[in-house]
């Protein structure tokens, strides 16, 4: 086990081999598709919606549509008509199993399905993976989570998941560690390193990334993709509700396990924040790409692979 987080780690540069950072390639392959960057907006109702999913797919960025008040049939039909990748989320309730049945009967097989529950190391997830595989075979790429241990990663892979999502409660609007005493909040990067030792398939680092440099750190410690909420929230195009405070425009950002998303105050493990509106989403993507190109140049390579080999230090200022 490794008790450190993003702010505790600094990566060490290697000799630069490019003349310009623009030469560095940030693309990543997940399943059958290659995407421009190893980042994906969190599948939260205040971060992603159908319009943004279409925009991201058209620009060759990965996305995962959230599962709240969502018509999967019409969405997948629309994406297939547009010849874009379809990527949806499911839970593990009875209606989710029925939805998989319906999609199969209609021959609407999504390219990606993310099984998305707070504690993903569970029999219910095993049953859902098996159900999807029985109905859809290998036609869809299954991402399962969320988990926090190497044993969980091994089990999900053994059950048939193509990738695992690592991170229990490290997100900015997640209060799992406060409500339950459990989770990876405060040591999320260590959890990625720990879990990656057991993984034979891709890991998606989910939560706890606060600045662009955390993407490179996630890759260094074993992540293939990074799921990010707060950095992608509160853009002009974001689905969060607009709120004006003292003539300043904010957007709501809340956790999937918050009472605001659930519509009831039961088993709450999320909260709501207001974030100042930060401009166009594609401007943030562009800045992330440039920063990640810089990371690759500091790593001494031309692709993301170079970051995986760099040395690092654990800072003396670390709380651990």
From Swiss-Prot:
Superkingdom: Bacteria
Sites where the protein binds NADP(+): 203-226
UniProt record, GO biological process: purine nucleotide metabolic process
Keyword NADP carried by entry: yes
Enzyme Commission number(s) from the entry: 1.7.1.7
Record-annotated active site: 174
Annotated Gene Ontology cellular component terms: cytosol; GMP reductase complex
PROSITE patterns from the UniProt entry: IMP_DH_GMP_RED (PS00487)
Keywords assigned: NADP, Oxidoreductase
Catalytic activity: IMP + NH4(+) + NADP(+) = GMP + NADPH + 2 H(+)
Keyword Oxidoreductase: yes
GO molecular function, one term: GMP reductase activity
Function of the protein: Catalyzes the irreversible NADPH-dependent deamination of GMP to IMP. It functions in the conversion of nucleobase, nucleoside and nucleotide derivatives of G to A nucleotides, and in maintaining the intracellular balance of A and G nucleotides.
Annotated family: Belongs to the IMPDH/GMPR family. GuaC type 2 subfamily.
NCBIfam families in the cross-refs: GMP_reduct_2, PRK05458.1
UniProt-recorded name of the protein: GMP reductase
Gene behind this protein: guaC
